[in-house]
């Protein structure tokens, strides 16, 4: 079983989400019981909606619980160095256009592309791992190959 890197903050968010989902369980069970009391289950939209909600809730709980043992919780304040690893904030320059982009490389459970946080497992994340400032990388993106120059590599600590 491989490990999944995650920050302490990210792990705390996932544990809080799990607690919230578990807290929701009794409400869903109550909604199912109330809908069942309404009679004919074949045409009872409330019952079917509550059962569907229960299924999605249980699937999410099971998914999170199955991932927790795989997490490798990383103290972001201990990260550093020249090489790009989990937790690095990297500024890239598109060799063709000259456009710069800045990404922070995190685990898959913390990635948020809109915030510039990419997964260590993404095409860009995979291409950057182990590289240093000044290197060039080719990313096999869905729209084709993109060549980037690595402008800077820094470690900022916790990401929120």
Swiss-Prot record:
- PROSITE patterns found in the cross-reference section: GREAB_1, GREAB_2
Superkingdom of origin: Bacteria
Q: Which NCBIfam families match?
A: greA, PRK00226.1-2, PRK00226.1-4, PRK00226.1-5
- Gene designation: greA
Lineage per the UniProt record: Bacteria, Pseudomonadati, Thermodesulfobacteriota, Desulfovibrionia, Desulfovibrionales
Fetch the InterPro entries from UniProt.
Answer: GreA/GreB_C_sf (IPR036953), TF_GreA/GreB_CS (IPR018151), Tscrpt_elong_fac_GreA (IPR006359), Tscrpt_elong_fac_GreA/B (IPR028624), Tscrpt_elong_fac_GreA/B_C (IPR001437), Tscrpt_elong_fac_GreA/B_fam (IPR023459), Tscrpt_elong_fac_GreA/B_N (IPR022691), Tscrpt_elong_fac_GreA/B_N_sf (IPR036805)
| Protein's UniProt name | Transcription elongation factor GreA
Q: Name one GO biological process term.
A: regulation of DNA-templated transcription elongation
**Does this UniProt record's set of keywords contain Transcription?**
yes
- Supply the alphabetized keyword list: Coiled coil, DNA-binding, Transcription, Transcription regulation
Recorded GO molecular functions are: DNA binding; RNA polymerase binding
Q: Coiled-coil regions in this chain?
A: 14-38
| One Pfam family here | GreA_GreB
Assigned protein family: Belongs to the GreA/GreB family.
Q: What does this protein do?
A: Necessary for efficient RNA polymerase transcription elongation past template-encoded arresting sites. The arresting sites in DNA have the property of trapping a certain fraction of elongating RNA polymerases that pass through, resulting in locked ternary complexes. Cleavage of the nascent transcript by cleavage factors such as GreA or GreB allows the resumption of elongation from the new 3'terminus. GreA releases sequences of 2 to 3 nucleotides.
